[in-house]
């Protein structure tokens, strides 16, 4: 294919999501948020940071000593309006549940799992794997953890721009 032909190729169309049952959605939302909560615990133990609303909540947590879970929930509140108006009721409610569950799990984890030291390289590799897998679970079941993910999924659905590229 010549460069002229490839530049005229159409942009990818919007991604069509599959419908899942209530049980499948509940299982995916729980598993996805559990994976992400474990990743955040690893990052926290190793003193690492993350981007988006989770990163903002981490920074505020380090500065104020208010728990990450509470801050994460509050930081995501402004994004629900965008989700409600652009992504619909189902997506917004699932996202709200996912954010609330992640906030709860991050509050619970320090009471059930503790470690004295974790290698930052190991924490970043395993945490990244858990984080990516958890977010994929959520995205495939029309949910997110708020923040920039809502915007990237909107752009994927509306304009065909892959969420991973945004």
Task: Describe the predicted segments one by one.
Residues 2-166:
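Core subunits and conserved enzymes of cellular information-processing
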């Amino acid at each position: 294919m010549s460069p002229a032909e490839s530049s005229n190729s159409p942009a990818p169309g919007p991604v069509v999501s599959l419908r899942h049952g209530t049980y499948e959605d509940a299982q995916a939302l729980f598993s996805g948020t559990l994976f992400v909560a474990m990743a955040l615990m690893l990052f926290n133990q190793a003193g690492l940071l993350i981007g988006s609303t989770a990163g903002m909540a981490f920074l505020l947590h380090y500065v104020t000593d208010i728990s990450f879970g509470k801050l994460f929930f509050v930081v995501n509140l402004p994004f629900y309006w965008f989700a409600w108006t652009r992504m619909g009721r189902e997506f917004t409610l699932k996202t709200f549940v996912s954010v609330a569950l992640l906030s709860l799990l991050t509050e619970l984890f320090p009471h059930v799992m503790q470690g004295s030291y974790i290698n930052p390289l190991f924490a970043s590799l395993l945490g990244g794997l858990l984080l990516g897998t958890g977010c994929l679970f959520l995205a495939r079941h029309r949910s997110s953890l708020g923040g920039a993910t809502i915007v990237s999924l909107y752009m994927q659905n509306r304009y065909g721009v892959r969420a991973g590229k945004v």
